[in-house]
Amino acid sequence: MDKRHDPSRRIIAPHGTQLSCKSWLTEAPMRMLMNNLHPDVAERPEDLVVYGGIGRAARDWDCYDKIIEVLQRLEDDETLLVQSGKPVGVFRTHADAPRVLIANSNLVPHWANWEHFNELDKLGLAMYGQMTAGSWIYIGTQGIVQGTYETFVSVAKQHFEGISKGKWILTGGLGGMGGAQTLAGTMAGFSVLACEVDETRIDFRLRTRYVDKKATSLDEALAMIEAANQAGKPVSVGLLANAADVFAELVKRGVTPDVVTDQTSAHDPLNGYLPQGWTMAEAAAMRKTDEAAVIKAAKASMAVQVQAMLDLQTAGAATLDYGNNIRQMAFEMGVENAFDFPGFVPAYIRPLFCEGIGPFRWVALSGDPEDIYKTDAKVKELIPDNPLLHNWLDMARERIAFQGLPARICWVGLKDRARLALAFNEMVKNGELSAPVVIGRDHLDSGSVASPNRETESMLDGSDAVSDWPLLNALLNTASGATWVSLHHGGGVGMGFSQHSGVVIVCDGTDAAAKRVGRVLWNDPATGVMRHADAGYEIAKNCAKEQGLDLPMQD
């Protein structure tokens, strides 16, 4: 019997102000853990899988139940320790310490590979936490929509003089992360053709308004794109097909998209990528009998897809890696020039990271969308001179369906995160908001990740693989008084290729919360400015000086 599979489970986080725990500081992690497994949020909630292949919220259902039980009895001077999705200890700390500390998927470097991890996983000794799955701050696909939107806007500026009308993006994957591409692309003015092998994912994206249309053949999909572009109105199409097949076929036909990328779960060749010519049922059966054959076939198909991406780049497409490690997989299969197209961070995002700008997100624990709309207005009030941000908030309200507890994300930096959070805390205190909010972020942020094939690719000083930085980030956030802090390995790009940390803090309207919020949401983005200043980026050095950061070696 698989202790991780229970189709009878239907998890919905409580709404409103009635507590199941002893305070909001423990109610918040409980609700957010439950929200990660909401049927409109998680990809396979019956298996505890939130997103990203096998990114889970808890190791198994026994562990999930015990975590909930412990959070409901936890005192405000105690801390729960969670080891790869398993609650392993409760210790007396103090009121400003985190209520939960989480470590997921971490392995000693020599053994930090999928083969060893999968053995531990089968033995029930480990859990893949991805980034926000095991750290209980996943908010559905909205979580990366704005970052993807910012990237596509940058692509238009760099390659098409800012004009995206009549242009289209080819991509793969409509899972928890990839599903953002279609909506973000159309928001940025592009049409999008996204290949997906799992029809239920396409249907889910249709239901949540992330995809406009579904196609079952390439000809049908291309006709939809062509019609939309002729009409001057972007459209997103989910094509039921294998990305490797489609990308290669477009090369064969001489059809060149304007932009090419991919967000399949290529980081996990065993569980995340369907080999060419295989059905999903065949792959599921083979995973139980011959893992090596699945991995080999998946990586061979990735090599086909990456070669097609390179060919489309040569034909004139703006081609970028979107952080799923597909280039590495293809390189290992003999595609020697797999890294000839850039990752999205060095190509488009790094200047933002240099100012501590990244994916700031918050969730209304009340369950009331009005709380989010009120905070949207507060963001506009406090940041009046950022039209791109205002445009994002307007589009998000109009086009993004909430999944589970209402949430919002917007990319803001060092100078704004703490003051926004303090304003939210004041709104809780004075009753403008009906219940507390939690504030967190993706682990994909300026100071919280080491990932040489993604966030820290091509660092100016060559420090791509130095992972001291996310460790320092987690330690500082713990010392600063975050409500829960997490330290993970392997998110985004898979085992052996990344280390990263997460942070969440509760705004419950108290003066004590205001002090914690002020520390955490200044220090957290400040570590990103510090990290990039240390690597030699002038934007970061100037930001550090302007914001008065004390960086001894920058004097």
From Swiss-Prot:
Its main location: cytoplasm. Keywords: Cytoplasm, Histidine metabolism, Lyase, NAD. GO terms for cellular component: cytoplasm. GO terms for molecular function: urocanate hydratase activity. InterPro entries: Urocanase, Urocanase-like, Urocanase_C, Urocanase_central_sf, Urocanase_CS, Urocanase_N, Urocanase_Rossmann-like, Urocanase_sf. The active site is at C410. The keyword Lyase applies. It is an enzyme of class 4 (lyase). Its cofactor is NAD(+). Binds 1 NAD(+) per subunit. It holds the Pfam family Urocanase_N. Pathway: Amino-acid degradation; L-histidine degradation into L-glutamate; N-formimidoyl-L-glutamate from L-histidine: step 2/3. It is found in: Cytoplasm. Belongs to the urocanase family. This is Urocanate hydratase. The lineage of its organism: Bacteria, Pseudomonadati, Pseudomonadota, Gammaproteobacteria, Alteromonadales.
